[in-house]
Curated annotation (Swiss-Prot):
Example GO BP: plus-end-directed endosome transport along mitotic spindle midzone microtubule
Name this protein carries in UniProt: Kinesin-like protein Klp98A
Region described as Disordered: spans on this chain: 597-621, 828-864, 884-954
SUPFAM superfamilies named among the record's database cross-references: P-loop containing nucleoside triphosphate hydrolases (SSF52540), PX domain (SSF64268), SMAD/FHA domain (SSF49879)
Boundaries of every Kinesin motor domain copy: 3-364
Gene that this polypeptide is encoded by: Klp98A
Organism the protein comes from: Drosophila melanogaster
Length: 1265
């Protein structure tokens, strides 16, 4: 049993930390390490210790090179590396791995630099240094090296070819443990070879630059040395196998600190996953060790006291890294962990986490054992048993029978031990010879393949027959003779075949230069050129000897030099063309031109020449061959010129067609943009007409209520007056006055004012005057009421006529929209046909074109086409959202223009408005849940019921105080008692039209867009109309109302003029369309809120009861998102939902606050008391400016009910927005946005108040707030 050794090492500040003016927070003394808390952390944790102390096996202070306690690479190796080498020679497995955040110095500690090597090179160097000493004493060694990386949880062999990807699979053997399938093992015999393996693997390892480290390791690397040693000790064989795992881990990282995006972010996620799994394994092993050192594989283990204790699950297989290091963590290995630390205060949390993991790792207990060969172990056991039998035989000399049995057993064991020893010796000798042969030949294993690394120049046979083997001929220093077996002098390379002479040629190797010397009359071809004099050959040359023996010449030294010189080029084009031409000439070897062709086995008469070659001294033949070669070269040059010309022609044609396609696509896109902009303008105009129509309907509703009130008042006056007349006449009749005058009132005679005036003439002067004044006064009041009723009826008729005109205009706009959609559909069909034609053209050009640039241009065209299709799809997409309420503005609701002006209102008025908004929020929640079932199939006008005739020009009248038209014929409807039916018809038309318009409004989402110049003017028009409506209800005087109407008409004229100018400017169309969409979205919510309030005040008692029951019925806990009150703000602040927390008396609601900031998003949960503390704190800090902001009051009863929570959610959201607006204008505030201010960021919010600081466990709705 052996505990895991832990060492910590502190690196110096890097350039990033120096630029940040980081402070030193690390201290070391002997084995004790102290981590100081940063200043802010110390202030926050006042009353606690301002440091953390840890004790490890080794502590290395490498912060300052001038410090006398500075720990060098040599010191780290002397403490840790020597132990690893000792373990290897003792037969134990060993593992060293570095752990820490990114940029903390892990790779420097493990690998080092060429001038200052780290642990891995030093361990390898010491391993082979001791190996050389041991070989002198007769010890045999066998060493293999492998190097792998774990990148994105996939394994790659770093010593294999570069084309090998990250596709190796991890397996687990029953007894040998985890291993990587097809991982290449490379036999190494000295330090230079293993250093070359390390350098080759590091060159292929994945690294990248981040904000925290310029050369950040993006993968975990494991360098494994398999070390086998065998020796005879005391006439006893000994063989041990040790595995040394040297691990360089990638560092843990935070995305906001490293600035990782895209692929770097994905790599960091996989790195953190494997490191988290490593930490989980360390924690589980430490906890298991602390619980009794149980390592049984069963679920329950028995303790010494007899009680059963559960064994923890160790998640080795949750990550590739921990799976491969299974034996190193709690298994058969002696392990050393190096914790790399950053001394800067900016990395305090990561450093503390690393120290805690290292402190836990101290408790891990490994179970290392000597890895002895099974045969050697059996031999040793037999030797022990033989010694035991000899001792038994020596002590049993008096008994004959037992001695014979023991003696027989002894002889049997000795014979078995001798056979095993001989087999092991023979096996080891064979293995050593194989290693020597592999080293001499340069053979090494790479996965399932074998690689031949020969250092000497050599020839490789290229056969046309069915031979499956590879023939390699090494060239010796000096002369290498090549010929046939018939030669008088033994040839170094003996060949057979047509054209091979007894002494064919010689190859001279001197000083790395190889020269081919052909013998007279011998056919020697180099790269398809016949040579008859010595020629120097180079790497890759193709050599033909005779007519059938083809070889490729390889010179490793020259190849290495070429790779170094041509490192920037992946392919030597000149060499490729040479080899290609050689292959074309050599292909003629397989073409037999036997004229009769009678027998397939007949030797061909011609191979390379039209006829069998004569003597090379024949000048006519040489001239003929030279002419043929010149002709072929000229033909090749002409073909090459024609190929280049055709290539240029195709390239020019493709470029012209591409430009034409781009131009046509641009024209098509411009046309579609114009159609879309025109459609957006028509939709905006339609929405404005809908808004005006709804305003007129609301005004009609108000006028109807006023007419009803006046009618009721008139009836009351008439009834009182009739009662007064009857009472007076009854008194006169009772007094006998009527009898004196000779007047007699019969029972059926109506008692009117004329009768009373006749009677009053006979009375005294005072009584007559009193009765006349009373009659005149009552008649005057009745006349005024009749005039008011007539005036309201004229207003009602004018509004009805205006609504009818708006409906006609809307029908025209709808028809124009349909025409625009048809035009756009035709354009899309044309564009689809154009794209199909373009694709066909690409296919044709792709078959003819031979250059890479043409493919690149076509890929660009395809990408542009895809972009165009995406844009088109965006413009034609529609939503199925349907809303019920019609857009209306009332005095109980604020418009977007009035948000900033509401800061000084008193709390009572704000509470009254928010009480009204409770029902509107419920209405918006119901609308959001799904389409309304009460929406009609079309728009139903008032005239549709037959109760309101159309208005004629002769019966219209215009009021100067309201500017609306009334139909006098509607008075008959009111007098006949059909006022309620008239209201119902108006309400039905309102709901149906609202539902239709909501389909258009629902197309656009609530996304912040830049505002065009029409935005502020449109909002002014809306505000002016709302002001006029408010004044109509408050009975403002006529002069002021005329001024408001004149202002509204002026704004409308300016809006129409600006809209016409905007249509002429193509550059502003897109921004205007976006603004219209955003404005409609905002107006839709505002009108929806007000309309629900207005309809609730007009409904009958039955409908009021139903709406009240719906508002206060049990509903979802999550409320609807609130309206955007500040569309022009940069920071979007919402309280979209609330959740219930606690139980019993501790039950409360917490509100989710979402703030979108320039440097990220902030989501926090806060209860009402925290909001109140924030308000009181801001009032205390900034005085009257904050006191003027309305804040929701405390509720004494039902404070934890859902309606109260819904009501407060809206008020708290408004309060936070107004608070940010006010505080951003105060120079002393941390979120001041003026000169010198930091503005609204996460840091400034935390500095403003602890309300915006997230807690340690506050990660979502399930955290604490």
């Amino acid at each position: 049993m052996s505990s895991l050794k832990v060492a910590v090492r502190v690196r110096p500040f890097n350039s990033r930390e120096i630029d940040m003016d980081a402070q030193l927070i690390m201290e070391m003394e002997n084995k004790k390490t102290r981590l100081l808390k940063p200043r802010l952390q110390s202030i926050r944790d006042a009353g606690r210790d301002n440091h953390h102390d840890f004790t490890f096996d080794y502590s290395y202070w490498s912060f300052d090179a001038e410090d006398p306690h500075f720990a060098t690479q040599e010191q780290v190796y002397s403490d840790l590396g020597n132990d690893v080498v000792d373990c290897a020679y003792e037969g134990y497995n060993a593992c060293v791995f570095a752990y820490g955040q990114t940029g903390s110095g892990k790779t420097f500690t493990m690998m080092g630099t060429p001038n200052n090597p780290g642990l891995i090179p030093r361990i390898c160097e010491e391993l082979f240094a001791r190996m050389r000493v041991g070989q002198e004493s007769g010890t045999g060694y066998r060493t293999h090296a492998s190097y792998l990386e774990i990148y994105n949880e996939r394994v790659k062999d770093l010593l294999a070819a570069q084309s090998t990807g990250h596709g190796l699979r991890v397996r687990e053997h029953r007894s040998l443990g985890p291993y990587v399938e097809n991982l290449s093992q490379h036999a190494v015999s000295d330090f230079d070879e293993i250093q070359e393996c390390i350098a080759r693997g590091n060159a292929q390892r994945t690294t990248a630059s981040t904000n925290m480290n310029d050369t950040s390791s993006r993968s975990h690397a494991i360098f494994t040395i398999t070390f086998v040693q065998a020796v005879f000790m005391n006439d006893m064989p000994s063989e041990t196998v040790s595995k040394i795992h040297l691990v360089d881990l990638a560092g843990s990282e935070r995305a906001n600190a490293t600035g990782a995006t895209g692929q770097r972010l994905k790599e960091g996620a996989h790195i953190n996953k494997s490191l988290v799994t490593l930490g989980s394994v360390i924690s589980a092993l430490a906890e298991q060790t602390g619980g009794g050192h149980n390592s049984s594989s069963s679920a329950l283990a028995t303790t010494p006291n007899g009680a059963s204790k559960r064994v923890l699950y160790i998640p080795y297989r949750d990550s590739i890294l921990t799976w491969l290091l299974k034996d190193s963590l709690g298994g058969n290995s002696k392990t050393i962990m190096i914790a790399a630390l950053s001394p800067a205060d900016c990395n305090y949390s990561e450093t503390l986490s690393t120290l805690r993991y290292a402190n836990r790792a101290k408790n891990i207990i490994n179970k290392p054992t000597v890895n002895e060969d099974t045969n050697v172990k059996l031999i040793r056991e037999l030797r022990e048993e033989i010694n035991k039998l000899k001792s038994m035989l020596a002590g049993d000399i008096h008994s004959l029978q037992p001695s014979l049995k023991v003696l027989a057993d002894l002889q049997k064991k000795e014979a078995q031990e001798k056979v095993l020893t001989e087999e092991w010796t023979e096996k080891w000798k064979v293995a050593q010879s194989i290693l020597q042969e592999q080293k001499s030949l340069g053979l090494r294993k790479s996965g399932v393949g074998v690689v031949l690394d020969s250092e000497m120049p050599h020839l490789i046979g290229i056969h046309n027959d069915v031979t499956t083997g590879v023939t390699l001929y090494s060239l010796k220093e000096g002369e290498t003779r090549i010929g046939s077996e018939d030669a008088d002098v033994a040839q170094d390379i003996e060949l057979a075949g047509d054209g091979i002479r007894a002494q064919h040629c010689s190859i001279f190797l001197k000083g790395g230069v190889v020269t081919l010397h052909p013998w007279p009359l011998a056919q020697c071809w180099v790269n398809a050129h016949l040579i008859d004099e010595p020629k120097q050959i180079s790497q890759g040359d193709i050599i033909l000897l005779g007519r059938t023996n083809i070889f490729r010449f390889n010179n490793p030294a020259e190849a290495a030099k070429l790779r170094k010189d041509l490192s920037r080029s992946q392919l030597d084009m000149s060499r490729l063309s040479l080899i290609t031409s050689s292959k074309e000439n050599l292909l003629t070897c397989s073409i037999y031109s036997d004229e009769d062709g009678a027998s397939p086995y007949k030797r061909p008469e011609r191979q390379y020449y039209p006829q069998r070659p004569m003597s090379r001294d024949d000048p006519e033949l040489q001239d003929e061959n030279r002419k043929i070669l010149d002709t072929i070269e000229n033909a090749l040059k002409q073909l090459n010129v024609e190929r280049v010309q055709m290539h240029d022609q195709y390239k020019t044609k493709v470029r012209k067609l591409t430009e034409e396609l781009i131009r046509l696509e641009q024209e098509e896109m411009d046309g579609l943009q114009l159609l879309n902009c025109r459609e957006q303008e028509l939709i905006a105009r339609k929405d404005m007409l809908l808004w005006e129509k709804n305003n007129e309907k609301v005004q009609i509703d108000i006028v109807c209520r006023q007419i009803s009130a006046f009618q009721t008042q008139l009836d009351s006056k008439k009834r009182d007056f009739s009662e007064y007349v009857a009472k007076e006449l009854q008194e006169l009749q009772d007094c006998g006055k009527l009898d004196e005058m000779g007047m007699k009132i019969e029972e059926g005679t109506p008692l009117n004012d004329e009768l009373l005036l006749q009677v009053s003439d006979s009375l005294d002067l005072f009584a007559a005057q009193f009765i006349k004044d009373t009659v005149r006064r009552n008649n005057e009041e009745i006349r005024k009421l009749d005039e008011q009723i007539a005036e309201k009826e004229r207003i009602l008729n004018a509004s009805t006529t205006k609504i009818a005109k708006v409906d006609e205009t809307m029908l025209e706009i709808q028809a124009q929209l349909e025409r625009l959609r048809l035009e756009r559909a035709e354009s899309e069909a044309e564009s689809q046909a154009m794209r199909a034609k373009k694709q066909n053209m690409k296919l044709q050009l792709g078959n003819k074109s031979m250059s890479t640039s043409t493919s690149t241009n076509e890929a660009d065209d395809v990408s542009k086409s895809d972009t165009y299709e995406t844009c088109d799809t965006f413009h034609t997409a529609q939503s199925n959202l349907s809303l019920v309420s019609s857009p209306t503005i009332t005095e109980g609701q604020q418009s977007p223009l009035s948000n900033c002006s509401c800061d000084a209102e008193d709390e009572a008025e704000d509470t009254r408005k928010d009480d009204l908004s409770g029902s509107s929020e419920e209405t918006s929640r119901t609308c959001t849940a799904g389409p309304s079932s009460g929406s009609g199939s079309g728009s139903v006008g008032i005239g549709g019921s037959g109760s309101a005739p159309s208005c004629t020009p002769s019966s219209q009248a215009i009021m100067s105080d309201s500017g609306v038209c009334l139909d006098s014929r509607n008075q008959a409807i009111l007098q006949n008692g059909h006022l309620n039916n008239y209201k119902q018809a108006v309400r039905t038309s309102d709901e149906d039209t609202g539902s239709c318009s909501s389909c258009e409004l629902g197309r656009h989402s609530d996304v912040a867009r830049p505002y065009c110049p029409l935005h502020s003017l449109r909002r002014k028009i809306a505000a002016q109309k709302a002001l006029i409506m408010k004044n109509l209800e408050t009975d403002l005087n006529k002069a002021q109302l005329d001024e408001h109407i004149a202002d509204l008409q002026d704004l409308q004229r300016r809006y129409i003029q600006m809209e016409q100018e905007m249509l002429q400017s193509v550059q502003d169309l897109e921004a205007h369309a976006q603004c219209c969409a955003d404005e409609r979205s905002g107006m839709e919510r505002q009108y929806e809120l007000a309309s629900s309030i207005m309809r609730s005040s007009v409904m009958s008692p039955t409908s009021m009861e139903e709406s009240t029951s719906q508002i206060y019925s049990p509903s979802m806990t999550r409320s609807c998102p609130s309206m955007r009150e500040f569309p022009e703000g940069e920071h979007f602040i919402t309280i979209p939902s609330f959740v219930m927390r606690g139980a019993g008396k501790q039950t409360h609601y917490e509100y989710e606050v979402r703030i979108a900031l320039p440097d990220g998003k902030l989501n926090i949960l806060r209860r009402y008391s925290r909001f109140r503390e924030l308000h009181l704190c801001m009032k205390h800090c900034y005085g009257a400016k904050i006191s003027a902001l309305p804040f929701p009051r405390r509720e004494l009863f039902a404070s934890n009910s859902e309606p109260v929570a819904k009501h407060r959610r809206r008020l708290l959201e408004l309060y936070l927005r107004r608070l940010f607006v006010v505080c951003s204008k105060i120079p002393q505030c941390p979120i001041y946005e003026g000169p010198g201010g930091t503005g609204l960021t996460r840091a400034s919010l935390v500095q403003l108040s602890s309300f915006f600081k997230k807690g340690l466990f506050e990660n979502g709705k399930h955290g604490t707030g």
